[in-house]
Amino acid sequence: MTSLDDPFRKARETDGVLRCPFQGDEIPMILRHEEVRRAAKDWHTFSSDAPFRVPIPSEEQLRSVRQLPIELDPPDHTDYRRLVEPFFLRAKQPAFVARIDRIVARLLDEALARDTIEIVEGFALPLQSRALTVLLDVPESEADIWIGWGVHVFHGNDGLTKARQLEDYLNDCFDRAEASPGDDFFSLLTKASFRGRPLDRAEMLGFANLAFAGGRDTIIHSIACAIGHLASTPADFAFLRADPDRIIHAAEEFFRVFMPLTHIGRVCPVATEVDGVAVEPGGRVSLGWASANLDGTVFDEPLAIRLDRRPNPHVSFGFGAHLCLGAAHSRTVMKSLLNALCRRVERIDLVSQRDRVEKTAAYDRTLGYDQLTVRMAPPTA
């Protein structure tokens, strides 16, 4: 991935929407930053209360439960989110950060001991999986199971098989938590109450399904793309190493430009119009996160990766009520990785790469890497 692309620029600047055929429907993707944020807050017009239809393509064939709380609108969304939000915000606590730092250090030890390392499956996937054990407060050994699922839980030719494996695994986790509750994420849900009643198993699965499927691609993709950029742009790596205080803004810029989720769906309860495109009741639109992040009316030189960019009002973690529950965790992992690279690596050399491209009827978008191999050199004495 040698340069950024923007397949939405022309439509964003002229029409404001891109008509995208998916699964027999033509879904208008909202492209402009201001309009995406406005729609994300307007749940009366653009509703998330649509099980399986918020992701695009939809996931009726991949899971049996509504993902919580993302596939709901306020006030239900608000009340469900309140049950788990404190658990996810632990990612800001020093003890949590220290555990992530130790995982990063161990994986970096292994990377530096090798001549070369493949980043996507050989580094980013293990880091994401082991960091998730910290977030869910389960034994790190569980990560070995998750790593075995591969990079994309719900994608590829075996997506349905993987989805069933995930649901079977989650049911086993809840069975164990109910039999012997602890302080982990699964036990939290078995003990939680929603409006005076215990959660049922479908609700528990809805939370857990999102925790596994929602953030997996995002973190793996962001890690790989950040390392790929530092390998292909040594000046930017030197810029960070010269002053680690720059890492906070650099992390946000990486999240802005390396957005793995192109868009997300909303269902219109009533007839509406989106930049001249009529949408019937029950029809879908999508919020173009990736396009909004490249809107030149908001971001100066949007295709330039500026590690000191500020302000940086990207929408990579969503906007409004549905702001990503895992945002703090993603930021902690990214900052921990960048800090460790700056301290312990002098140079990252690109050895080989194979770009990952999202191909659709309406656009082709480079998403990062299917494979990325680099050589990391420690500082010379």
Task: Label the predicted regions.
Residues 1-381:
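Cytochrome P450
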